[in-house]
């Protein structure tokens, strides 16, 4: 009585088919498959962006900084 026999499973499947119908179950499975595909695609996109290295930035010490013009000509300096 505690274990489920094959007849119990047949009755359960028959009730599910009667409640949902074949069309709804196939639509549901299609939606699940689309969700899994979208999830896998999102995971692949995340891996691609993580693998892409950031460009190396260099500093040119000889070039003056933009907007940093020196205007100390003619200014008074105190010692």
UniProtKB/Swiss-Prot annotation:
Classification via Pfam families: TatA_B_E
Predominant localisation class: membrane
InterPro entries found in the cross-reference section: TatA/B/E (IPR003369), TatA/E (IPR006312)
GO biological process entries: protein transport by the Tat complex
GO molecular function: protein transmembrane transporter activity
Keywords carried by this UniProt record: Cell inner membrane, Cell membrane, Membrane, Protein transport, Translocation, Transmembrane, Transmembrane helix, Transport
Gene3D superfamilies reported in the protein's UniProt record: 1.20.5.3310
Membrane topology: Single-pass membrane protein
Region (Disordered): 43-79
Highest rank taxon of the organism: Bacteria
Transmembrane segments annotated in the record for this chain: 1-21
Positions with biased composition (Basic and acidic residues): 43-60
Compartments it resides in: Cell inner membrane
GO CC, alphabetical: TAT protein transport complex
Family membership noted in the UniProt record: Belongs to the TatA/E family.
Oligomeric form and interacting partners: The Tat system comprises two distinct complexes: a TatABC complex, containing multiple copies of TatA, TatB and TatC subunits, and a separate TatA complex, containing only TatA subunits. Substrates initially bind to the TatABC complex, which probably triggers association of the separate TatA complex to form the active translocon.
Function as written in the Swiss-Prot or TrEMBL entry: Part of the twin-arginine translocation (Tat) system that transports large folded proteins containing a characteristic twin-arginine motif in their signal peptide across membranes. TatA could form the protein-conducting channel of the Tat system.
Protein name, as recorded: Sec-independent protein translocase protein TatA
């Amino acid at each position: 009585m505690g274990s489920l026999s094959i007849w119990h499973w047949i009755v359960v499947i028959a009730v599910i088919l009667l409640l949902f119908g074949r069309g709804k179950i196939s639509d549901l499975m299609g939606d699940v498959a689309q969700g899994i595909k979208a999830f896998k695609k999102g995971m692949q996109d995340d891996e691609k962006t993580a693998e892409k290295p950031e460009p190396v930035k260099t500093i040119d010490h000889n070039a003056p900084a933009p907007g940093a013009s020196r205007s100390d000509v003619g200014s008074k300096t105190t010692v």
